[in-house]
A protein has these predicted regions:
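Von Willebrand factor
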Residues: 143-186, 195-196, 223, 230
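C-terminal motif of bacterial Sec signal peptides marking the signal peptidase cleavage site
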Residues: 15-18
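Short beta-strand-loop
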Residues: 33, 40-61, 135-160
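Extended non-globular C-terminal regions
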Residues: 311-489
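Bacterial signal peptide processing site
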Residues: 20-22
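DG-centered beta-turn motif at the end of beta-strands
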Residues: 104-107, 184-199
Length: 489
């Protein structure tokens, strides 16, 4: 019996040792296989095998529960997980394929830009970036002409394809937006923005473009981004308004050109980050974005403290740091913290807003002309300040930090409103769907005196106005959002 017990004890000990060795072997094998899997994925990853790779990754994550891991093992596994997550973030998914159509307007009026260093740098940057995606490239005028090695042809000034005497922007834009809508893809158009008015009537330009866009926007929420850039132009400019025989004008100067992007919100956001990043584009000037409606409504709160505040009020709900209704409102005389020259007999406060999900450029959000406020009350908007510009030692900055930490939010802007009369009621602040001021300033009705003119483009404002109206009509709404506040005695 004792001999049997001894054998049993020895047998159990051997099993334990064996299990420990097997476990150690399995763990080493697991870590080696996991690392090989991640390396292989980094080197050979494409969207077609995404789901298969993701399933394998999940298996590895599930398996780690089988082992007793040291702190070093945990760090190794966390590092491998992070590497794989980075691959997912930077690779288009099978479920949401990301393809790109690149359209280069090749009318004769584009030839002058091919001498410009800034223009060529932008083309190299953008066309180079789209090579990381499924893509097709086209020269476009009144038809599209698919091209291989389009960058090489642009660089060698070999862009004469099709009818280069005329550009049909209705066709170009409709074609681009339809391509983006059909496959949840991105369309990029490069153009000089000059609208060819064959019948001489510039007033019908916005109507034609609006109608073309309305058809394309009917069933999709495609967005449009317009970028204005500048480059050297050396060559012949073809005027739309000069008399026959005087339309071809030799110039050597800077001229604006434009890049338009079409796609849904997520596609546009990614494109502006990875493909057409404006910080990497020499000659970039301005940006506008057109959309039917916001993906989400912004959050906002009245600031109970800060340099913006003149007068007295309390939150309607006691103990709240996040509120849109105030009571016990009183005007105040001058304050050493007050903004503006006339600080007597004034009531004023700031509203912190999170515009981060609106998709609209800062230049649009910070333009006072794009806002309206309840006319029946006596308030006006004094200022729209970016949070990044708030002084770090100010009372406003401290108040913002307190609210953000307590409510797990991050604001982007402060809207300051002020009134001397009609203080009480329901105050509405609306962000309207306006044509950005820079677009209005970029258009001209006379391009005959083109020498020395480096900022305007014939009928460009009319062209973009048509796009803007199409988006307004799709949503049947003249504003993007409304901030609602209640102010009581």
């Amino acid at each position: 019996m004792k001999i049997y017990s001894a054998y049993l004890t020895l047998f159990s000990f051997v099993i334990i040792i064996s299990c420990k060795r097997d476990n150690s072997y399995d763990l080493d094998n697991y870590l080696n296989r996991f690392e090989s899997f991640v390396e292989n994925t980094e080197n050979n990853y494409n969207s077609d095998v995404r789901s298969q790779k993701l399933d394998s990754f999940n298996d590895f994550i599930e398996r780690k529960k089988d082992f007793k891991l040291s702190s070093e093992n945990i760090r190794t596994i966390n590092s491998l997980e992070k590497r794989f997550e980075n691959i997912l973030e930077n690779t288009p998914s099978k479920e949401n394929p990301y393809s790109i159509n690149f359209y280069f307007e090749n009318s004769a009026s584009m030839n002058g830009y091919l001498e410009g260093t800034e223009f060529l740098k932008v083309m190299y940057r953008v066309v180079g970036n789209i090579q990381n995606y499924d893509n097709k490239s086209f020269f476009v005028n009144s038809n599209e002409h698919q091209q291989s090695n389009i960058l090489e042809k642009i660089n060698k000034k070999q862009i004469k394809v099709g009818d280069i005497s005329n550009s049909d922007h209705q066709f170009i834009f409709s074609n681009a937006i339809n391509s983006a809508s059909e496959n949840n893809s991105l369309s990029i158009v490069v153009t000089d923005g000059i609208y060819s008015v064959t019948d001489g009537n510039i007033d019908i330009v916005p109507i034609k473009i609006e109608q073309a866009f309305q058809k394309s926007l009917k069933s999709k929420n495609t967005e449009t981004v317009v970028l204005k850039l500048t480059s050297k132009f050396k060559g012949t400019y073809y005027s739309e308004t000069c008399q026959p025989g005087k339309k071809a004008i030799k110039i050597n100067q800077s001229r604006p050109y434009y890049m338009l992007l079409f796609g849904d919100s997520s596609v546009i956001d990614k494109a502006l980050k990875d493909i057409v990043n404006v910080t990497e584009l020499p000659g970039y000037n301005e940006q506008a974005r057109f959309l039917s409606s916001l993906q989400s409504k912004p959050i906002y709160t009245i600031l109970s403290q800060g340099e913006e505040k003149i007068g007295h009020f309390k939150p309607a709900k006691r103990g709240s740091s996040f509120f849109t209704e105030i009571i016990d409102v009183e005007k105040s005389k001058a304050s050493r913290y007050s903004k503006g020259e006339n600080k007597e007999n004034v009531f004023q406060f700031g509203v912190a807003v999170d515009f981060s999900n609106t998709d609209l450029p800062n230049s649009y959000l910070e333009d006072l002309g794009n806002y309206s406020i309840s006319q029946e009350m006596g308030y006006e908007i004094l200022d729209i300040q970016n949070i990044d510009d708030v002084e770090k030692n100010s009372r406003t900055y401290k108040e913002l930090n307190k609210i953000q930490e307590a409510n797990k939010v991050e604001f982007t802007h402060i809207i300051t409103v002020s009134a001397q009369t009609n203080l009480f009621g329901e105050l509405e602040i609306s962000l309207n769907k306006n044509l950005p001021e820079w677009i209005k300033e970029s258009g001209t009705t006379n391009d005959c005196e083109i020498k020395g003119e480096e900022k305007t483009t014939f009928a460009f404002d009319q062209l973009i106005q048509g796009i803007s109206k199409a988006y307004q009509k799709k949503s049947n709404n003249s504003n993007y959002l409304t901030i609602n506040l209640k102010i009581k005695i």
